[in-house]
Amino acid sequence: MNAIWIAVAAVSLLGLAFGAILGYASRRFAVEDDPVVEKIDEILPQSQCGQCGYPGCRPYAETISCNGEKINRCAPGGEAVMLKIAELLNVEPQPLDGEAQELTPARMVAVIDENNCIGCTKCIQACPVDAIVGATRAMHTVMSDLCTGCNLCVDPCPTHCISLQPVAETPDSWKWDLNTIPVRIIPVEHHA
């Protein structure tokens, strides 16, 4: 019985000693993060899609902050993210990267043909924002509110039942260009 208590005490002391060493090392060798990188990373949509040319949102945020990379390369975030980053960095907003377009292209979402879905879950594993729901050997569906249109779920699908489709424009989602609407100013007469 004494041998068991000695072993328990020895393991506890070793755990305490190694914990103290690790605690000291974590404070002694801590690396300070750039607060600007943290703020940019919080603004980005965290879809980790790679459409900006970087493997994820964090590396893109680091190159924006440290190397002066363009702020207009995040396709899933679109114009809203670019404007927030421009405001944070006090730089001029830039047109979205890609083909020159006056308006932002329509938002795309993944759509699954549920009749052909075999429930392999490969699309669920590929989705960086967990916008696809379903179970093994059961049909899957996409929650369009969460889908960023990053296209990462299309290629892994063995039955090719996933496609990207534009979101239907409604009066709420339409981007009204109010500068093109002709306005006539009518003078108002004041009577005393």
UniProtKB/Swiss-Prot annotation:
Keywords from the named record = 4Fe-4S, Cell inner membrane, Cell membrane, Electron transport, Iron, Iron-sulfur, Membrane, Metal-binding, Repeat, Translocase, Transport
Required cofactor names: [4Fe-4S] cluster
**Where along the sequence do coiled-coil regions lie?**
none
In this chain, [4Fe-4S] cluster 2 is annotated as bound at C117, C120, C123, C157
**GO cellular component annotations, sorted alphabetically?**
plasma membrane
Q: How is the cofactor bound?
A: Binds 3 [4Fe-4S] clusters.
PANTHER family hit by this protein: ION-TRANSLOCATING OXIDOREDUCTASE COMPLEX SUBUNIT B
Task: Provide the function of this protein.
Answer: Part of a membrane-bound complex that couples electron transfer with translocation of ions across the membrane. Required to maintain the reduced state of SoxR.
Describe the family membership recorded for this protein in Swiss-Prot or TrEMBL. Belongs to the 4Fe4S bacterial-type ferredoxin family. RnfB subfamily.
What is annotated about its quaternary structure and interactions? The complex is composed of six subunits: RsxA, RsxB, RsxC, RsxD, RsxE and RsxG.
Name of the protein in its database record: Ion-translocating oxidoreductase complex subunit B
**Organism name:** Escherichia coli O6:K15:H31 (strain 536 / UPEC)
**What does UniProt list as this organism's lineage?**
Bacteria, Pseudomonadati, Pseudomonadota, Gammaproteobacteria, Enterobacterales
